[in-house]
Amino acid sequence: MEALTFPRYSPDDIVAYLRSHVLVGAEARNLTKADLFATLKPEVLHMIFIRILQKVYGIRLEHFYMMPVNVDIVYPQIFEGFLPVCNLYIHMERFLPVCRVNDFQMSDVINPKAKRTARFLSGILNFVHFRECRREAYLELQLNYKSAMEKHQQLETANQELEMKLEKLNTVPVEQQAEFKQLSDDIQELEQLLSHDYRRKTAALQEVISQKKSDITERTRKLNELKVTMATLKEEQEQLKSKIVESPEELKNYKELMKETVKKLKKSKQEVIEKYEGYRDLVEVLPSCQLEVQLYQKKMERQAANVERLASVLSEVRNLEDQLESAQIELKKGKTDEMSLKRLVTAKHERLSTAEIRIKKKREDVEQYKHTVFEYFNRVQEKRGVVYDKVTAIQKEIQQMRFKIQQLNESAEEEEMKAKEIYQNLKAGLEKRHDSLIKTAKNYAASREDKIAELQKGLLRVQSPGSSS
């Protein structure tokens, strides 16, 4: 039995715990260490067991004096004195296995021993301490759960009320539904028109841009071809330069001719530069060279062919300039169309902004109404909190009154127990007195009969000698 699942308490700890946690009032003050360990009193141990059962299971005091109703007893008055002890043993036999004590016997109630009682009380105190700890945690959890449920219900009700109010606020009044519908239709129509115009104008601008890009690529291709032809002409000129015969007369005549041609070329070059400054890179001026070729008419023919080619190039350049001017005119037209579209878009945006201002104003009105509703709700909540505080204060007062009533009931029960004990003692004393009186009466009657018999015998003796004489 030494391998226990609970600690063994010292007698001082057991007495201190019983005084502070189990017993109250005069019972706690009158309890001493000698009542449980030095000279163990069964009635004190019975009182402690009863208080522990009342604390743990809530068993009332009159239950220990109740006769079982499921058994037929012929003479119940015989069991009246033994009934509280028997009920106490039955309850303790059920309770102590919970405290990990499995060897409780009837003799531990009728004739208790100090060591076994200390072990039983150690197990009981360990269980009571564990129960109090778990009970506090459970009560705290229960209180938190109750408060959370109340708060949850309050929040649910408040949420439902607010949802109803929000639905009421979000619904458009009947007198404003037509205006609201008209505004929404106008907004949708404006959005559709703006998106359609924007798509159409963007498509047109994309087409114009793609066309301009194709024209620019074509012109760059033609310019590259002209550059290639000019490079070939330069190569031919260099080849002809190497074949020229250096004769002074022919050179002089050739120089004069070349001067005239150079003047003509310079004049034509000046005209080309003045008219086509933007295409200076396309038409490169032939370098002034001292061509001393008089005997080669083929070279002059080639130069004439080059002049014709230059004229054709200039005509192409003029055509390109005309095309560029027409493209610029079309671009200006596109810009004017874009400006008109921008004006239309700004007008539509102004209409949208006015509609948004109206909607914003309505939303502000709704928000203001919501704010007033929330303020009213907060005031109601404050009033409700004040009422709740009053109710809690009243409930605390009720609990205090109940606690006082319970204390009064306990004191009344204690007085009743004392009165019953006094009654039982008086009854036992009277019964003993009656028994002694009956015994004395019987003894007196027996002695009287003996004396009467002796007197009769004496009389007979006295009478017998007289008769004989």
UniProtKB/Swiss-Prot annotation:
GO BP term (any one): meiotic chromosome segregation
Coiled coil among keywords: yes
Highest taxon, organism lineage: Eukaryota
Keyword field: Cell cycle, Cell division, Centromere, Chromosome, Coiled coil, Cytoplasm, Cytoskeleton, Kinetochore, Mitosis, Nucleus
Cellular component aspect of the GO annotation: centrosome; cytoplasm; Ndc80 complex; nucleus
Pfam families (alphabetical): Nuf2 (PF03800)
GO molecular function: microtubule binding; protein-containing complex binding
General function of this protein: Acts as a component of the essential kinetochore-associated NDC80 complex, which is required for chromosome segregation and spindle checkpoint activity. Required for kinetochore integrity and the organization of stable microtubule binding sites in the outer plate of the kinetochore. The NDC80 complex synergistically enhances the affinity of the SKA1 complex for microtubules and may allow the NDC80 complex to track depolymerizing microtubules.
Protein name: Kinetochore protein Nuf2
Organism in which the protein naturally occurs: Gallus gallus (Chicken)
Organism ancestry: Eukaryota, Metazoa, Chordata, Craniata, Vertebrata
